[in-house]
Every structure is written in C-alpha cells, then in structure tokens.
C-alpha cells in the first residue's frame, strides 16, 4: 500500500521578509556582475566590462524594492561604477572619450545607458577632451528620459555626485564654462530631482500614504545636496545669490506645492548659505514663507532663521548694513504670516514671538520699544484665543518664556515694568501661572537687589504681582493651597518692602502708603506676613526723619514736625490695628510697644500714651492665655521703664494701669511676681530719664507680698522673687525699701515657707549667700 505524500503549505513571507529577499537577490546579482566587470577591466576587455556594468545597472530598474532598500542597492552599484570611472581615467584603453561616449549610447535600456553616459561623461570632462558646459548640458537633458520617481531620483543624484568636482567655477576658462553654466546645471538638476521626489507620494496606495511619506523623508538628502553644491561654488557671491540663485530656488519651492518638500528645502536653504546672504535677501525668504502650504511648519523655519541672524548680528555688528532693519523686517513679515494663516497653532505663534523677542534683545538691547511691540502683538493675539488653547502646557511654557526673557536680559524689574504690554500679557494666564510669573518677578527683584525709589514704580510692581497680594476670582480655596508654599511666597513679597527706599522722605512715606493700600487687600492669610515689615520700616523711617531734623539736614519747626509725626502715627496705628482686627493679639501688642518706644524716642509724647492705651486694650480684650498674659506684661513693664516721658502724670497713669492688669492675672503667684516687677516702674534710672517714687516702690512690693502670703500653698519661689526685687533696691543704696522690711521678709521665708523638698530651695540658698557676701547692715541671717 502506497503512502500518501503530505500536502505542502506555501510559506507566506511578511512584507519585511519579502523586501529583504528581493534586496539580497538584487545585491547578489550586482556583486556577481561587478566581479565580472572588474575581471574584464583587469584583462583590458573594456567592451565586456561595459556590458557587465550595464547588467549591474539593470538591477536598479527594479520596482520591487522600497526606497530604503533601493538606496542600499544603489550604494553597492555606485561603488562598482566608481571603479569603472577610475579605470577610464587612469588606464590606457586605446579609445578616445568621444568614441566611448558614443558607444555607451547604444546600450539597450534607458537606465543603463544614462548611468554609463554619466560615468563616461564625467571622465570626458575631467580629461578636458570636451568643454564641461557642453557635456553637462547634454547629460542633464538626457536624464529627462527617466521619469520613474525612484529611479529618476537616484539617477540625478548619481549625476550630481560624479560631476561635483568637475563643475566650472571662478577659475575655469570661458571655453570650458563659467560659474553661470554650473548654476544652471545644478538648478535644473535640483528642479527635476525635487519634482521626482514630490511625485513619490503617489506611488503608494492611500492606506500606505504615511509609510510612503516616511520613506520620502529618508531620501531628502538626495534633493538637498543640490543646494549644498550651489553653496559650495566660489563663484556664487551675494549678488549672484540674490539675483540668480535664490529666485529660481524659491520659485521651485513654491510651485511644488508639497508641504514635506517645502519644509525641508526651506530649512536646508537657510542652513547651507551664509548668514550675510540671508541678511541681504531677508524679505524674499520671509515672503516665500508666507506662500508655503498651510501644513508647513513655518515657525521652525523662521525661528531658525531668526536665531542664526541674531547670533550673526551679535558677533558681527559691523557687518550689518545700517539700511537693513532686521527686527522691522522680521516683525512685519511675521505679523503678515500669522494673519494669513488663521489655522496656525497658537504654540507656533508664541514660538515666533519668543524668537522675535530674543532677536531684538540681542541685536537692539537698548531699544525697549521693540520688545514692547512683540509683547503687545502677542497679547492682542492671545485675547482672541480660547482659554483651553492658552492653557495648554506647550503654550503656557512659551508665554512664561516671553515674560521671563526681559527679566533675564535686563536684570532690573524697573526696566521690565516700563514695557506697557508686559502686565496685560500676564493677565492672560491662569491663576497658578500668573502666580509663577509674579514669583519670578519678586525673585528677580530680590536677587538683583533692585532699589525702587519712585511711588509710581512701586505701584506698578505691586499691580503686576497682584496675584500674590490679594484674593482673585479664579484662585483655589485656601484649604487646597499648600500652607508652607503660601507662607514662603508671602515672606518673599514682604521682603520687597526693604527694597522700597528713597532719599526724599515725602516720596518714601508715599511709597509706604501705596504699599499699605495694596497689602491691605490681602485678607487675613496674607497681611499677617506683609504688614509687619511695613510697620517696622515705617518706624525706622520716622526715626531717620527725626535724626535728619535734629541734625539740621531737614529744616522743620516744631509744629510742622508734630503734624508729620501725627500722619505717620495714624499710618502705623491703622496698620497695626489691621493685624489686631484679625485676632493677631500677641503680635499687635508687641508692635504697639515697638511703636511706643519709637514715638517716645522721637519726642511725640501724646502719641506714646495713645499707643500704650491701645496695647493695654488688646491685653485686656484679646490676650486670653495666662502664660501669654504674663509674658506680655513683662514686656510692657520693660518697655515703660525704658521710656523718656517727661510728663510724670502720663507716665504714672500708665504705670497704675499696668499694676491694675497685673493684679488681674489668673494665678496669685503670677500676680505677686508681676506686681513686684512693677516696682521698677517707680524707680527709673536711665541716661535719658530719672524718676524715683520710693513710696510707690514699697507699696508695690508690699502688695505683692500680701497677695502671695494669703495663699494656702504659696510656694517658696515667689517669696524669693520678691526678696530679690528688694535686694535690687538695697544695692542701689536707696531708702525706698527699708532694711527692716527685707530682714523681716528673710525671717518670714526661713521660718514659714522653707521645706526640704521645695525645688526653689537652691534659689533661696543662692540668694542668702548673696546677702551674706554683701554685708547689708541691719539684715541678720
């Protein structure tokens, strides 16, 4: 019984595998034919070699290979043809070039015929057996015979490669050809090459269009090399470029109406020719950009040109003719291009503005109007765009860059704020981005230590960074804002106040009023940070002002001084009150005391009493924590003790109020300690003021002792505190505190309140040692 054969299944290759197979077959054939060609040449069999060379080129007639694979095959074939080229030039083959030139024209197929013609023709030119211009003209015309996009493209590339060192230039004889002949040859080849490259898009079905476009891009150098050849000709000077080369090149770029070709060719045009040429033909290039297809990325083209010319003008300012206004040309053309392209992406529009701004600040750093024009044009475009477009990350990045560039270049916020279109551009951003820009402005001001002397400039700055200063409609809820970041931002804003300064006191006070007006809108979360330094700067201001008056720098009579002091008092008082109104009691209390000392130093006594009363009022109504009350009273006593109030009635009234508040403290120990401390209010021994009231001193100490003695568990520490206060007056050798009173107090402590476990016992022992060391008369230990 016969076995049945298993049916064979045809193996299906993937497109990539199939392509690799076709390429390997073609390459192997080329290498086989190339091997035979070399053997024939080595044996001086030229006609056989030409036959094998024709066979090599026949492999390039294929339509099975992708452009990428075809390119690889072309390179293999090119190497063999170069071998033939070298042989024809170097070997004695017994034939004239004119004969060979005619022989190869009888090759059977068009493509091998033309490759061989070009190969022989290049040697024909090199051996100078025929004028270059005639051979080049003949070859360029014959290449029209191949209109297949891929085959024609590589044929013309071969023509360009093998003739590149044989083109007539400035040192050529007239008979051989001139540089104009070379220009005509290259431009004609460029035009036809580009047409073939553009036609490649139609070789693939619609569904494969994207793949074909990518393959086309891989071959772009074959077209661009023609422009490189033009740029390498020594005979192409600026005049020739402007009048001959550029018009023909841009005509082809515009007429091809292909976005890929237009994009690449404009980019390569800008790359290969010198900056001086572009400078002289700027209008033509930009007008060409305006005529490109809508899908062309003109932003990249123009930005590249701007960057190149900006760098050139910076390095070679003396080479830029006065009649060429680079910025004006770019600005006007860019504006027209944007208007002519209503569908142009916003990020591309913004990118052009960034390039324009960099251009003007590099080429015309002192011309602020140009920068302002760029910002103004940008702002006028943005206001008509949808918010979702403006807030795209790419667009936001460009806008912020536009706003950052002037800060980085000028390093002076005063210069930047004179750009009238700067602030309106900020307002186009979302809250978080406005805040970021505002922080950049603040950081720039601080880092460069920019002193702001004019009220108008201060107002302009604070209006510009208003996102940091007050609540805005589009800001997130305070609960959603990072507290540490917020505090850091507000601290930076507050530090600006120290950069507001002027030698003119009137201007400086006006600056503080303006700052207060802006900061006052900040709400409770902000003013706790911003108003405090404003208070201190205002107090420093009145001290300095008083010093100038006293030294005669400023001439002012007493009444005028009091009037000015009253204005500053009102300003400071209202500023502190704003903090008190948001329940910052402890802070407000301390600021009132600071102000109290300052106004006392300046001799404004009536204001001292008002400030002390305000401080006492806050103490009574708003400081509830008993520990905070103790600390506040200690601070108040110290402050009052340092004053130089000449009016004893006012001073004694304040001292009495202080004792009254001390007697209202929660804990008897605190009452006694603070009242004993109040005794110092009646014994002032300062260089600026002498005031002693022995009766009041003793009365305060007795009152303190009475309070603590009535406690069931008074504790030793408070008694020792009172004893130490008494010793202070003994050391002053005053009769305010009788020795007998001190002696009785010591005895009372030793007999009644000393317990072995009391933590204050070492305190008492040290005090006793001190008494013993001083040998007070009348105090027995």
Curated annotation (Swiss-Prot):
It is found in: Membrane; Endosome membrane. It comes from the Eukaryota. One of its GO terms (cellular component) is endosome membrane. GO terms for biological process: intracellular protein transport; protein retention in Golgi apparatus; retrograde transport, endosome to Golgi. It is a peripheral membrane protein. InterPro entries: Vps35, Vps35_C. Keywords: Endosome, Membrane, Protein transport, Transport. Plays a role in vesicular protein sorting. Component of the membrane-associated retromer complex which is essential in endosome-to-Golgi retrograde transport. The vps29-vps26-vps35 subcomplex may be involved in cargo selection. Component of a retromer subcomplex consisting of vps29, vps26 and vps35. Belongs to the VPS35 family. This is Vacuolar protein sorting-associated protein 35.
């Amino acid at each position: 019984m016969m076995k049945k054969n298993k049916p064979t299944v045809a193996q299906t290759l993937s497109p990539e595998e199939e392509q690799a197979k076709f390429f390997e077959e073609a390459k192997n054939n080329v290498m086989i034919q190339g091997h035979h060609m070399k053997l024939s040449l080595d044996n001086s069999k030229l006609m056989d070699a030409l036959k094998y060379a024709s066979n090599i080129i026949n492999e390039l007639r294929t339509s099975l290979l992708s452009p990428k694979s075809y390119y690889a095959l072309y390179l293999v074939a090119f190497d063999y043809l170069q071998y033939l080229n070298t042989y024809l030039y170097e070997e004695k083959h017994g034939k004239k070039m004119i004969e060979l030139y005619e022989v190869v024209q009888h090759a059977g197929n068009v493509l091998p015929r033309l490759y061989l013609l070009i190969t022989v023709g290049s040697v024909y030119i090199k051996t100078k057996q025929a004028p270059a211009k005639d051979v080049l003209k003949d070859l360029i015309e014959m290449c029209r015979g191949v209109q297949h996009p891929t085959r024609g493209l590589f044929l013309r590339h071969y023509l360009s490669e093998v003739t590149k060192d044989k083109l007539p230039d400035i040192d050529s004889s007239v008979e051989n050809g001139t540089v104009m002949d070379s220009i005509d040859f290259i431009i004609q080849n460029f035009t036809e090459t580009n047409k073939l490259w553009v036609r490649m898009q139609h070789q693939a079905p619609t569904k494969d269009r994207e793949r074909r476009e990518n393959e086309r891009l891989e071959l772009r150098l074959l077209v661009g090399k023609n422009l490189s050849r033009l740029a390498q000709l020594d005979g192409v000077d600026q005049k020739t470029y402007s009048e001959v080369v550029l018009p023909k090149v841009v005509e082809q770029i515009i007429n091809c109406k292909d976005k890929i070709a237009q994009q690449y060719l404009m980019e390569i045009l800008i790359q290969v020719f010198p900056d001086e040429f572009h400078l002289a033909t700027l209008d033509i290039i930009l007008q060409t950009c305006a005529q490109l297809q809508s899908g062309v990325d003109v932003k990249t083209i123009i930005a590249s040109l701007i960057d190149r010319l900006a760098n050139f003008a910076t390095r070679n300012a003396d080479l830029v003719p006065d009649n060429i206004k680079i910025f004006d040309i770019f600005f006007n053309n860019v504006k027209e291009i944007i208007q002519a392209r209503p569908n142009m992406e916003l990020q591309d529009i913004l990118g052009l503005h960034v390039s324009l701004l960099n251009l003007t600040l590099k080429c015309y750093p002192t011309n602020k109007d140009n920068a302002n024009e760029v910002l103004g044009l940008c702002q006028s475009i943005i206001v008509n765009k949808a918010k979702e477009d403006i807030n795209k990350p790419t667009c936001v990045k460009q806008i912020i860059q536009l706003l950052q560039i002037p800060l980085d270049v000028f390093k002076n916020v005063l210069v930047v704020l004179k750009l009238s279109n700067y602030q309106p551009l900020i307002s186009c951003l979302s809250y978080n981005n406005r805040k970021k820009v505002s922080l950049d402005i603040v950081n720039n001001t601080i880092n460069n230590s920019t002193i702001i002397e004019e009220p108008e400039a201060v107002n302009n700055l604070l209006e510009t960074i208003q996102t940091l200063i007050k609540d805005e409609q589009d800001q997130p809820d305070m609960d959603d804002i990072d507290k540490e970041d917020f505090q850091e931002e507000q601290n930076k804003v507050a530090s600006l106040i120290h950069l507001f300064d002027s030698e003119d006191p009137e201007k400086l006070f006006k600056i503080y009023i303006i700052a207060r007006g802006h900061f006052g809108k900040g709400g409770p979360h902000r003013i706790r940070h911003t108003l405090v330094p404003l208070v201190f700067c205002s107090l420093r201001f009145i001290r300095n002002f008083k010093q100038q008056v006293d030294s005669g720098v400023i001439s002012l009579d007493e009444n005028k001084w009091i009037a000015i002091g009253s204005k500053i008092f009102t300003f400071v008082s209202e500023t502190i009150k704003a903090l008190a109104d948001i329940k910052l009691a402890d802070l407000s209390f301390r600021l009132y005391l600071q102000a109290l000392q300052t106004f006392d130093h300046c001799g404004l006594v009536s204001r001292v009493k008002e400030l002390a009363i305000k401080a006492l009022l806050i103490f009574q109504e708003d400081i509830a924590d008993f520990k905070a009350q103790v600390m506040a009273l200690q601070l108040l006593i110290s402050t009052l003790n340092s004053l130089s109030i000449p009016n004893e009635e006012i001073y004694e009234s304040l001292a009495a109020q202080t004792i009254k508040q001390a007697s209202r403290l929660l804990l008897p120990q605190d009452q006694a300690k603070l009242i004993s401390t109040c005794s110092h209010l009646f014994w002032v021994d300062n260089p600026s003021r002498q005031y002693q009231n022995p009766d009041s001193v003793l009365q305060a100490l007795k009152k303190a002792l009475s309070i603590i003695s009535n406690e069931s568990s008074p504790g030793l520490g408070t008694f020792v505190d009172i004893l130490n206060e008494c010793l202070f007056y003994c050391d002053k050798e005053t009769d305010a505190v009788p020795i007998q009173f001190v002696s009785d107090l010591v005895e009372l402590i030793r007999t009644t309140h000393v317990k072995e476990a009391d933590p204050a016992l070492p305190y008492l022992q040290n005090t006793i040692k001190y008494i013993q060391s001083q040998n007070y008369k009348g105090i027995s230990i």
